[in-house]
């Protein structure tokens, strides 16, 4: 289905836009624009960049403070196409999570203040001097949702007035391993992945719509189904009803697979939907694998070993009919369809 055409090394989390790769390189922590062959097309003058974000319009990053190495308040914004400087100044913004952005607007909140910032103009739209708890997991049309285990906090997006805080532990009493990992907006509900299970809550009043008492770390939403592939298990949840389906497999366990005469456990943590298949990252004691799973039958359609990696797969993404795979050793593998 896919063949590897390029491996780029020493690269931190990347962004892919208009056929170009934007990434912080490990060598000097300098942000670079790369071609798909790894050629450097542009690089920022600033080094030791801490956090960065790139979209269609801008490149934004920050450096550590000159006074405090644990504070990152030297912020730079460049026009992505022209590479001209839009903004340079001392402002503490939370850039490490893509979930804090909604288009060109950044919703940056800390235990000190809240800053709603236009990254296209380099302009503060609103600053609110009040602390907020936790980490931002979701920005919707109306709300900003943060988590601080075992609570979620739902704020009005425009002014960060608190709508509701809710203890997710109430739905899983006695479960010590509960941890809020992901939150999704689905119709008029929130889907909360809480490690020990999944809950679906009304956005209006927080009431329980349904609950799934099965281990979950991640979910891939396709239509009205949520697909969970965690450790060795694989199952599907109907997001309207909460109906659980494990493909008639005991303990929802995926079958072992054989590759080049060796048997492997299909242990991984996430599936990604693309062109009718679920693409699953698999960890083994030697090399990682990618398995394409039919979401209707749960059967394997394609198995590929990444022999040039000895680490875990971090992410699988698809852009312009190419597959991009990163591992935990800062490598990016680019695949093209055969």
Task: Tell what function each PLM region has.
Residues 18-26, 57-70, 102-109, 142-147, ...:
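Short beta-strand elements that form the blades of beta-propeller/WD-repeat-like
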Residues 307-338:
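Blade-level signature of beta-propeller repeat domains, shared across WD40, Kelch, NHL, RCC1
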């Amino acid at each position: 289905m896919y063949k590897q055409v390029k491996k780029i090394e020493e690269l931190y989390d990347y962004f892919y836009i208009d056929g170009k790769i934007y990434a912080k390189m490990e060598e000097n922590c300098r942000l670079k624009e790369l071609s798909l062959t790894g050629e450097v097309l542009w690089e920022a003058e600033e080094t030791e960049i801490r956090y960065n974000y790139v979209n269609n319009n801008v490149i934004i990053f920050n450096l550590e403070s000159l006074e405090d190495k644990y504070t990152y308040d030297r912020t730079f914004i460049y026009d992505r196409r022209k590479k001209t400087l839009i903004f340079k100044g001392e402002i503490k913004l939370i850039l490490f999570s893509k979930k804090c952005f909604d288009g060109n607007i950044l919703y940056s909140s800390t235990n000190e203040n809240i800053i709603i910032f236009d990254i296209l103009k380099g302009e503060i739209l609103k600053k609110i001097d009040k602390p907020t708890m936790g980490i931002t997991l979701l920005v919707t049309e109306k709300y900003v949702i943060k988590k601080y285990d075992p609570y979620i906090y739902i704020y009005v997006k425009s002014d960060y007035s608190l709508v509701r805080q809710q203890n997710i532990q109430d739905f899983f009493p006695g479960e010590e391993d509960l941890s809020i990992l992901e939150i999704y907006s689905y119709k008029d509900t929130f889907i909360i992945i809480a490690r020990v299970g999944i809950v679906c809550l009304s956005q209006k009043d927080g009431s329980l719509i349904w609950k799934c008492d099965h281990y979950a770390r991640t979910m891939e939403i396709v239509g009205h189904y949520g697909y969970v592939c965690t450790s060795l298990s694989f199952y599907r949840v109907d997001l309207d009803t909460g109906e659980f389906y494990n493909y008639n497999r005991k303990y929802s366990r995926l079958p072992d697979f054989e590759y080049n005469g060796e048997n492997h456990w299909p242990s991984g943590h996430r599936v990604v939907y693309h062109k009718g298949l679920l693409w699953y990252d698999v960890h083994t004691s030697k090399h990682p694998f990618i398995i394409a799973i039919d979401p209707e039958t749960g059967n394997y359609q394609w198995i590929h070993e990444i022999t040039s990696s000895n680490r875990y797969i971090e992410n699988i993404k698809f852009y312009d009919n190419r597959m991009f795979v990163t591992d935990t050793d800062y490598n990016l593998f680019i695949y093209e369809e055969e």
